[in-house]
């Protein structure tokens, strides 16, 4: 099992933290375990409350059912169903930008 460094950033929220996330754990769950308060609602990849934007790196979010291909192409991720597949940087609190 691999573990990746996931950096969560959001200037408006004063957030800039790097956490270690195993490749079989969702990023949102790992953030909560580390005491980082991220927005979420359904926890099933079916809404946009937990949306973030991938600045660098890669994730597997094949369990999500909300984002369309254009949004995924633009780098949006649903942290509640995203597994890291490399070290990555994610800008959090991005739900508003989807609309």
UniProtKB/Swiss-Prot annotation:
Alphabetical list of SUPFAM superfamilies matching this protein: 2Fe-2S ferredoxin-like
Keywords: 2Fe-2S, Electron transport, Iron, Iron-sulfur, Metal-binding, Transport
Cofactor note (record): Binds 1 [2Fe-2S] cluster.
Binding sites annotated in the UniProt record for [2Fe-2S] cluster: 42, 47, 50, 80
Family annotation (InterPro entries): 2Fe-2S_ferredoxin-like_sf, 2Fe-2S_ferredoxin-type, 2Fe2S_fd_BS, Beta-grasp_dom_sf, Fd_pln
Cofactors required: [2Fe-2S] cluster
Family annotation (PROSITE patterns): 2FE2S_FER_1 (PS00197), 2FE2S_FER_2 (PS51085)
Protein name, per record: Ferredoxin
């Amino acid at each position: 099992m691999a573990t990746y460094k996931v950096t969560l950033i959001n200037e408006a929220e004063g957030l800039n933290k790097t956490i270690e996330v195993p490749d079989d754990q969702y990023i949102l769950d790992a953030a909560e375990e580390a005491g980082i308060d991220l927005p979420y609602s359904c926890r099933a990849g079916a809404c946009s409350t937990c949306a973030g934007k991938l600045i660098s790196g890669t994730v597997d979010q094949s369990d999500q059912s909300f984002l369309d291909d254009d949004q995924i192409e633009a780098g949006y991720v649903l942290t509640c169903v995203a597994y890291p597949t490399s070290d990555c940087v994610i800008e959090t609190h991005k739900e508003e930008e989807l609309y």
